Amino acid sequence: DSSTSRGLGDVYKRQMLDGTIPVEMQDKYLNIILFETERLNKLTKSLIDLNQFGHHGIHLDIADFDINTMIRTTILTFEGKCNEKGLSFDLLLTGKELFVRGDMVKIQQILYNLIDNAVKFSNNDSSIKIETSIRNEKVFISVKDHGIGIPKDSLSKIWERFYKSDLSRGKDKRGTGLGLSIVKEIVQAHGENINVISTEGVGTEFIFTLPLSKKEG
């Protein structure tokens, strides 16, 4: 994760210096570099938190924030990878803004990890659907890809630390196997749920919930 992001930043910087990225587009790519730098700093803290979950529980900084804006910002990070694979995002977001209650830093990490997996395991020239919806004072966030899917005998194991299925080993040799473990522990720390629906050879959908902010009431 960190080596990929640093490499992406180096590529963008070289392309800005040699003129591959035109001047009028440089602000956009500088913002991506800054976003990634900040996210990696937060990831380091998340890994420390993960190590402490079993000892002291996880500390949450709860606030109201717009999950739709967070989704739109997070997908910008994956523009380069998506262009390489011919992937597109299909956003089905409820309302222009949708406020939830949660720890912004940690929820952003959930989104990054789920979208990163979707990009990684999607078939070329396919789409990734990200959806937000409201039911019974809960906001449901879904990330769905069209790709290799997860074998049935691996579904119950994907949340374990360092677990990687045989299919993912070939696709993601550099991954830590911590991503989904972090995701589940953060969701549970919020008192919420995350589920996975997957068919091998078809694709995977992750769905997690967050409390609807009273701002939406």
Give the predicted meaning of each segment.
Residues F35-L40:
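Short alpha-helical segment of the dimerization/phosphotransfer core of two-component systems
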Residues G191-E192:
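Conserved glycine-rich
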Residues I150-K164:
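Short conserved segment of the HATPase_c
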Residues D61-D66, N83, S88-L98:
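Conserved catalytic submotifs in the C-terminal HATPase_c
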Residues A118-V119:
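Short helix-loop "hinge" at the ATP-lid/N-box region of the Bergerat-fold HATPase_c
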